[in-house]
């Protein structure tokens, strides 16, 4: 096992870091006998606060160390200095010339030490100067600057690679934070596990350019800590911070675009910060943020954040474009009662982007209508926000028609559209306003003043804060086309300053939909969004990242979705909601809004350095509020959820104080009398546990109930079925004062329950014996109850059972055994919804719909339309209905009607994700209902609809049965060949290479699936169900095994037959699965 390398340093050893007097040259190598074996003799070294850097002149490598107390922890392997890329190859033939060390300098981060390394390439003649600076102030940070001098001829470089660091001490896994903005975070998740035990090779480019704004930072870390590398620039520029898996670790580096280095000239290629840190990415990002402060990129101070930035918010986007002024005003009483203090008027209020004029269809009386809305909001004690898109000048706008000189022009002289991440387009995005055109920025300021002074809004939600295309407009006199991209934040700065001039307490949010935020926009906002996360764990991890970059006090929002509530509250996020809530959804919202309003963790101090994501047993977050520590532990959606129930450790408490641990969601004590220096306890939870540590001066007398959340069933309960001879026993030490015992061999008791856990409580005594315990007719263990007399003992428990009906049976095998009580954790069986695929003939389509395909869809296909008013309709008999669709930035909005009544507008626009529950309505009366999905704006789509059929009893749980290709139940016709490989389900498969060969299987169930291969030499098969042709399946494609090739659901109850016929060889069968009700 490779552990951390930790070596003690004496004072005399530390003094060895002071290699030479100030401004000395041609420095002698370091001599560090106290660290023999770690620091090689002859290496050069500099040190700063929490960091040490050594340079091996012979190997031309840099090694980073983290100092901890009086010791060193090696963080990087000896890593090469970066080089120029010429002709597709990195130049690496540099020879050492000199290494100069200054022990006391004033550098970019103030006082520290500096090392200057000079070397020359034999093949190109380039002289490289590599400068490293440490800081006495910023912990763990190293500043690096690189320059090149050309010799007698020009040198054309396509790319410059700066610092490169390979992590030291990795074992089975590394975690990587990736701030690049080249694509939506659904696919380019910011936090990824690099599994060193698999055969894959992790690689992320992490780009920032004219199509991708980003956090220009990457981090790799293990349990001992990690290394962060980020761009050290006061303005945005093109930069990559790639992370690449190596043979036994991973490396992080930085690079910038190439240039032509003219003969005899010197160019600076780029500057960067590296941070060595303990813990996870939070510490790395915080170190980067602190270093960037020295470059003038400074985040808002706590005093600059208005109270409204911490308020609970509701947004009109839940109605899409179908809102009206009166509809919003009519909602205010309800929202005020729920504790909402902020209202956002979202998209749909304006005529054209760029003009940002009130839409007369929404505001027939113009500004007076806008004031009617904002006045009503203010009368309810709320603030009013207005949605817009900064930098967007529109396409059909008056602004573009009258002032085309304000706009970015591409290389062909055409107006350039604002890009989506990675360089795509979006129908809602217009032409880009150039930040170097004075009139362009003035137009943004004019809008801000109009919205605040004439319409009464208190702040703004800026959306689509992605990147800015390069500008070739000759009227702007750009130093280079990249200047428009590099200066994009000027629009944000000037707009924000105009907001503050109108109201010092103005609210301003900028949102990078689905990508990391533009780092250079951060100083100009008072709240930051987690930006369209697609899972709860993405929400939590982004909160932690932005708290590191903005400050522990800075308000961060979660997304508007009910499953986000526990993640928002526990991480100290600001809750926002957009839906027109009713029924159980409204009750859930009011519950969590009430909890959030009580604890107010969004106003607390986020503490991000106590737990390491990916290495502590649970995904954990901590917020301190008014002197009380709040902890949030999560398993739902986590990338590394533990097995079982590890002990929970509360870090950061006062070691000299005693605490009671309270689950503040359910108002229950989960542990008590814990000292801060050993605050460890154990409790069971499913998705999350949110607790606070309450200081107590005296120990609590009452123990914590271990059966909290369990239902107790006494020995006399009629649900218990006794067989054989049993006797009643009465004693105050028993639960309810009674128990039942037997000394008859094979006497038994049976108890059936619906739940996920079961416990048997009884006695131990010297005359007691043994009992067999059966669970669902399977012998689990033999319990020995013989021992010192004790009542109320948990003699057996089974936890984490499937949510289903179970039976426990206790059989006496020797001596005496007794039953005091059972305790079980109840579960409500999820009702079984009947699914109706988009291609089902049960769905009626009106208008122009087209079929399209994706393996992630329910049945591999969906329907879409962009025709105005086109609709899809399903009639069903049931008590609940759900509608599933794909989300994408290419989709718009749709109206949902239920039994002819408009009930909701759904938003399909957003972070790319398939199989999304877009609409749900429960509690319908039994009988026939009709759901209709109607196109409202842009493209819409439908994956499937599910409904809960009428039923008197819950549908039994479904069971999935797997049938291997070699199973005797399968009937093969024609020539089939056996295939053996460990990639197959059971190591075997069968394939047909002749047309007409078939395989048939009879089953009883409601769903059937065929799994097999795709390959470039495979062909086509026809699938029949109950002798009726269903689908032709094309299995030709890129090689892949274990693919779901065919699926048929919604089969009526009963026996069915599937037949697969080879039309064009080759086809294969790995296995079938079918679903039946147990």
From Swiss-Prot:
> What protein name applies here?
A type blood alpha-D-galactosamine galactosaminidase
- Name the reaction it catalyses: an alpha-D-galactosaminyl-(1->3)-[alpha-L-fucosyl-(1->2)]-beta-D-galactosyl derivative + H2O = D-galactosamine + an alpha-L-fucosyl-(1->2)-beta-D-galactosyl derivative
Outline the protein's biotechnological or industrial applications: 5 ug/ml of this enzyme pair converts A blood type to O blood type in an hour, and can be removed by centrifugation, showing the pair can be used for production of universal type donor blood.
By sequence similarity, the record places it as follows: Belongs to the glycosyl hydrolase 36 family.
More about this protein: DNA was isolated from a male human fecal sample of AB+ blood type, the sequence was given to UniProtKB by the submitters.
Q: What is its EC number?
A: 3.2.1.-
Could you cite one Gene Ontology molecular function of this protein? alpha-galactosidase activity
Which ranges form a coiled coil? none
Activity's sensitivity to pH is recorded as: Optimum pH is 6.5.
Name the source organism.
Flavonifractor plautii (Fusobacterium plautii)
Q: Where is this region: Not required for activity on soluble substrates?
A: 699-1078
A Pfam family this protein belongs to? Melibiase
> Looking at the record, which segments are called Glycoside hydrolase 36 domain?
306-570
Extent of the signal sequence: 1-26
Q: What does the UniProt record say this protein does?
A: One of an enzyme pair that work together to convert the A antigen to the H antigen of the O blood type, which together release galactosamine. Catalyzes the second step in the conversion, acts on the product of the first reaction (FpGalNAcDeAc, AC P0DTR4). Is specific for galactosamine containing sugars, does not cleave GalNAc residues.
Which InterPro entries does this entry report, sorted A to Z?
Answer: Aldolase_TIM, Alpha-glycosidase_related, Glycoside_hydrolase_SF
Q: Which UniProt keywords apply?
A: Glycosidase, Hydrolase, Signal
* Outcome, altering residue 463 to A/G/S: Loss of activity
């Amino acid at each position: 096992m490779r552990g951390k390398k930790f070596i003690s340093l004496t004072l005399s050893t530390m003094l060895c870091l002071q290699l030479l007097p100030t401004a000395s040259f041609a420095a002698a190598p370091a001599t560090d006998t106290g660290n023999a074996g770690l620091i090689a003799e002859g290496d050069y070294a500099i040190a700063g606060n929490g960091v040490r850097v050594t340079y091996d002149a012979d190997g031309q490598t840099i090694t980073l160390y983290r100092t901890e107390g009086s010791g060193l922890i090696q963080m990087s392997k000896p890593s090469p200095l970066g080089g120029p890329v010429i002709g597709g190859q990195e130049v690496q033939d540099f020879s050492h010339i000199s290494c100069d060390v200054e022990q006391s300098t004033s550098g970019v981060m103030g006082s520290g030490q500096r090392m200057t390394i000079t070397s020359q390439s034999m093949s190109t003649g380039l002289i490289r100067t590599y400068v490293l600076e440490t800081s006495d102030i910023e912990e763990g940070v190293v500043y690096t600057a690189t320059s090149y001098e050309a010799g007698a001829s020009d040198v054309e470089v396509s790319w410059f690679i700066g610092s490169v660091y390979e992590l030291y001490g990795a074992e089975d896994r590394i975690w990587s934070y990736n701030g690049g903005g080249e694509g939506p975070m659904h696919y380019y998740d910011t936090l990824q596990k690099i599994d060193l035990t698999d055969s894959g090779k992790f690689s992320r480019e992490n780009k920032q350019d004219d199509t991708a704004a980003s956090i220009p930072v990457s981090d790799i870390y293990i349990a001992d800590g990690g290394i962060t590398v980020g761009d050290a620039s006061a303005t945005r520029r093109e930069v990559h911070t790639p992370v690449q898996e190596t043979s036994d670790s991973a490396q992080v580096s930085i690079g910038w675009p190439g240039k032509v280095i003219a003969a005899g000239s010197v160019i600076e290629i780029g500057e960067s910060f590296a941070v060595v840190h303990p813990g996870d990415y939070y510490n790395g990002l915080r170190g980067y943020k602190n270093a960037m402060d020295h470059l003038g990129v400074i985040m808002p101070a706590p005093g600059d954040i208005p109270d409204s930035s911490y308020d609970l918010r509701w947004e009109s986007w839940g109605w899409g474009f179908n809102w009206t002024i009166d509809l919003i005003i009519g909602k205010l009483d309800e929202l005020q009662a729920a504790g909402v203090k902020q209202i956002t008027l979202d998209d749909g209020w304006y005529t054209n982007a760029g003009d940002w004029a009130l839409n007369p269809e929404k505001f027939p009386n113009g500004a007076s209508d806008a004031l009617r809305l904002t006045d009503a909001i203010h009368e309810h004690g709320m603030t009013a926000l207005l949605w817009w898109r900064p930098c967007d000048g529109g396409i059909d706008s008056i602004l573009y028609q009258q002032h085309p000189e304000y706009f970015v022009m591409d290389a062909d002289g055409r107006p350039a559209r604002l890009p989506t991440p990675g360089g795509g387009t979006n129908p809602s995005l217009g032409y880009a306003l150039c930040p170097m055109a004075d009139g362009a920025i003035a137009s943004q300021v004019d809008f801000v003043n109009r919205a605040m002074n004439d319409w009464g809004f208190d702040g703004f939600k800026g959306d689509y804060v992605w990147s800015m295309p390069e500008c070739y407009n000759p009227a702007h006199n750009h130093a280079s086309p990249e200047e428009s991209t590099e200066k994009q934040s000027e629009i944000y700065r000037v707009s924000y300053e105009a907001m503050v001039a109108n109201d010092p307490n103005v609210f301003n949010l900028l949102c990078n939909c689905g990508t990391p935020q533009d780092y250079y926009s951060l100083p100009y906002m008072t709240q930051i969004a987690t930006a369209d996360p697609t899972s709860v764990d993405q929400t939590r991890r982004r909160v932690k990242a932005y708290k590191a970059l903005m400050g522990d006090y800075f308000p961060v929002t979660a997304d508007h979705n009910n499953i986000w509530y526990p993640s928002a509250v526990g991480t100290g996020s600001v809750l926002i909601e957009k839906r027109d809530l009713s029924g159980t959804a409204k009750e859930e919202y009011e519950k969590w809004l009430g909890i959030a309003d009580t604890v107010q963790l969004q106003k607390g101090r986020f503490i991000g350095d106590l737990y390491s994501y990916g290495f502590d047993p649970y995904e954990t977050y901590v917020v301190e509020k008014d002197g009380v520590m709040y902890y949030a532990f999560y398993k739902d959606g986590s990338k590394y959820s533990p097995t079982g129930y590890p002990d929970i450790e509360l870090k950061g408490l006062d070691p000299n104080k005693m605490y009671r641990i309270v689950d503040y969601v359910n108002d229950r004590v989960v542990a008590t009398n814990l000292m801060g220096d050993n605050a460890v306890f154990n409790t069971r939870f499913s998705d999350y546990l949110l607790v606070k540590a309450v200081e107590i001066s005296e120990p609590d007398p009452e123990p914590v109930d271990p059966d909290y959340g369990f239902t107790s069933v006494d020995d006399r309960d009629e649900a218990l079925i006794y067989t054989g001879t049993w006797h009643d026993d009465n004693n105050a030490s028993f639960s309810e004062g009674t128990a039942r015992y037997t000394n008859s061999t094979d006497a038994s008791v049976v108890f059936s329950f619906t739940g996920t856990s079961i416990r048997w409580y009884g006695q131990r005594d010297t005359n007691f014996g043994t009992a067999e315990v059966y669970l669902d007719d399977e012998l689990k263990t033999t319990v020995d109850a013989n021992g010192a007399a004790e009542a109320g003992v948990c003699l057996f428990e089974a936890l984490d059972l499937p949510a289903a009906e179970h039976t426990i049976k206790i059989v006496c095998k020797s001596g005496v055994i007794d039953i005091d009580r059972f305790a079980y954790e109840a579960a409500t069986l999820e009702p079984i919804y009947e699914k109706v695929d988009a291609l089902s003939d049960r769905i009626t389509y009106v208008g122009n719909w087209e079929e399209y395909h994706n393996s992630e869809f329910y049945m591999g296909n969906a329907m879409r339309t962009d025709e105005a008013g086109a609709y899809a309709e399903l009639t069903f008999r049931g008590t609940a209905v759900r509608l599933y669709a794909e989300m994408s930035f290419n989709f718009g909005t749709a109206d949902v009607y239920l039994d002819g009544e408009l009930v909701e507008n759904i938003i399909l626009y957003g972070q790319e994700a398939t199989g999304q529950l877009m609409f749900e309505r429960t509690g319908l009366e039994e009988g026939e209902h009709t759901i209709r999905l109607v196109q409202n704006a842009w493209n819409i789509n439908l994956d499937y609809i599910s409904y809960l059929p009428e039923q008197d009893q819950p549908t039994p749980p479904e069971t999935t049965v797997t049938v291997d290709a070699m199973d005797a139940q399968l009937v093969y016709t024609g020539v089939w060949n056996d295939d053996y490989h460990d990639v197959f389900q059971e190591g075997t498969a069968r394939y047909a290479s002749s047309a007409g060969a078939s395989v048939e299987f009879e089953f009883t169930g409601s769903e059937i699936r065929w799994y097999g291969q795709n390959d470039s030499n495979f062909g086509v098969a026809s699938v029949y169900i109950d002798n009726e042709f269903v689908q032709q399946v094309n299995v030709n494609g890129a090689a892949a095994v274990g693919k779901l090739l065919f699926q048929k659901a919604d089969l009526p109850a009963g026996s069915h037959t599937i037949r697969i016929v080879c039309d064009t060889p080759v086809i294969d069968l790995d296995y079938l699965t079918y679903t039946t009700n147990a």
